[in-house]
Design a protein with these regions (language model features):
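A structural signal for short, well-ordered beta-strand segments
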Residues: 89-91, 112-114, 187-191
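Helix-adjacent hinge/juxtasegments
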Residues: 76-87, 91-92, 98-105, 109
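Catalytic core of non-heme Fe(II) oxygenases with the double-stranded beta-helix
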Residues: 95-165, 193-205
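Short, compositionally biased
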Residues: 179-189
Length: 207
């Protein structure tokens, strides 16, 4: 019998209802007023400054709930349950018509998003396959193809609810299409382990 294997898959974690409704509402109320940095690509997208868990009791509570998920994600990526910490957090407010262009997150191993409001189905986060080098590209792409995990060049996060968390390797390219719904609010963050050990070649990280 023929078998097909997905070699070296990329982990992506979705953790429903990681933050409870009370905490979600508190984050929305407190940080909506602090988002004043306008996105370079969209006037309808505002961000807070980079924040740290210690900046607010709400962030401390959120980080306490998120960190065990980071440990689980790290075990998939590095094969060991390491000590993880959140480096920075920020809140994003996207009004109707706003968008976030394709990007990834530097100086980080795992990035995450907590959805704080209901999302329009067409405004879920989209992840893109890296384009590779500058060599010639050949594609078979038209109306009659059937997308599979092996030929697709993008993937959209399934419908989310307030309090849901997603985690992904920080190098993954992602974007948000034009928001067709009401105000879209998310909490984003970057995380690192305390260190890595490759047969005695150790490196330590600090927040």
């Amino acid at each position: 019998m023929d078998e097909v294997f997905g070699l070296f898959p990329t982990p992506f974690m979705r953790a429903p209802a990681t933050l409870n409704a009370r905490l979600v509402e508190g984050l929305v109320q407190h940080f909506s007023a602090l988002a004043s940095s306008r996105n370079k690509a969209s006037d309808s997208l505002l961000h807070t400054e980079m924040l740290h868990p210690a900046d607010s009791p709400l962030f401390v509570e959120a980080a306490t709930l998120i960190t065990p998920k980071l440990v689980d994600m790290g075990a998939l990526m590095f094969g060991e349950r390491l000590d993880w910490s959140i480096k920075e957090m920020w809140v994003n407010l996207m009004d109707r018509g706003g968008l976030q262009t394709m990007h990834n997150h530097s100086n980080s191993f795992v990035s995450g998003v907590v959805y704080l409001t209901a999302m329009h189905p067409e405004s879920q986060t989209v992840f893109m396959k890296p384009s590779g080098g500058a060599e010639f590209v050949f594609k078979n792409e038209h109306a009659n193809i059937a997308p599979t995990p092996f030929n697709a060049d993008r993937w959209t996060v399934p419908q989310t609810a307030p309090g849901d968390l997603v985690l992904f390797p920080s190098y993954l390219l992602h974007a948000v299409p034009v928001n067709q719904g009401e105000r879209r609010i998310t909490l984003s963050f970057n995380a690192i382990p305390d260190g890595l050990d490759s047969w005695g070649y150790k490196v330590k990280f600090g927040t």
